[in-house]
Amino acid sequence: MAKPNILLIVIDSLRFDKCHGPKKSSFTPTIDSLIKNGIYFEQTISSAASTILAVGSLLTGLYPFRNGLGGTGYQKLNPKITNLAKILNANGYTTYATAPEIANDFGLTCDFQNPDSSYDNYFSLFSGLGDEILTKFKNEHFQSPWFFYIHLFDLHSPVILPSSFNDAKFGISQYERMVSAIDDWLSKLLKFIDQKNTIIILTSDHGEYIPVLNTANGLINLESSSTEKNLWKIGNKIPKNLLPIKKKIALTIRSSRKKLKSSKINSENLSVYEKRVLFDSRMFTGHRMYDDLLRIPLILSGPEIPQNKIITNMVRQVDILPTILSLLSISPPPDIDGQNLLPMMNKKYDEELISYIESPPSVENESMKYIGIRTSKYKFIQNIKGKKFYELYDLEKDPLEEKNIFDENANQVKIAEKLLDEIRNKKPLQKNIEFEKNEKQ
């Protein structure tokens, strides 16, 4: 039997609840069809709310602190680390990538075989990129078996929406209307794909705060203005060697945006979660480790994959690489953090996975670094340097992460710290120690 082709689609900043489920208002028949003809993991956790760290985990099966990308500042992927492109190159696959240039800058696409693997960060599907990709699939005869990684930046803030989708029927926000627009483009792409012989993986790198809320007093929408979008474009054109200037522009945008938001609404009657969504920024504010930023979609569709199945168990971004390799009967590297999800896909699976999470480097304070763990029931966060800082959330009782309960759960904090130590130092996890035990001291 011929080896299947592999199409990996990463939609930057796509949240799990805006891909499938009752909280979405976008129109997504293509994504819906992929789910109907495959598997949807509805509780997939990203390693970090940053493109570089997250895609690094996806392509290596390793947490950021183990593949060279983790740290208090952005660093390149360790070139000695085995990654998905290297493995598939060695197993007879032709590997292609179309990803924003930021991925290439940090070594994420260096091992793909096509020389045109990167594009300008602000070249969008609807300004020519989409047609370029479709032309490749229409006219080029990719050498089979092939692996193609496509990373779409159109949902990344600020969203610049094509006018043809700026209509309420495509979603209540610019963000969701863009999801509809991307879905429409995906339908065109899939016409060129032999889905009977192609494994399709659709996922995201991280989530996003969407500053749009339905309240008793009406809709609050604080999405990016056209002025802010133009400032981002200017900042993007500044050379990398002028980083301090780029950072100054970023902080100026944040400051002006915060003032504008504060002037528009009265925050006194907003909940902790509502204030976070409206006023915080994934790229600037706090530790950036809440679920809006870390829960991502994961869809697998294609040969040998069960159909119309939704898996509620928590899985991790690092599990994607070993799962792809297992579908191809290729042994994954022995020392990775991820685990093969095929057993979970094919039968009931009761083992609880633990996800390691970490904060991206901070624009304002590069020494600020947080790490944590997440299970299906709890999330624990702590800082690495300085005075100890803890957050603990009961995700079953408090899914919006509004009440920090670490004060009354000292024993759980100790268990969580032990688990973090075991993960970061690659020790065997103590199976007899359950993070979920609610024992108070």
Regions found by a protein language model. Give the residues of each.
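Catalytic domains that recognize anionic headgroups
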Residues: 1-441
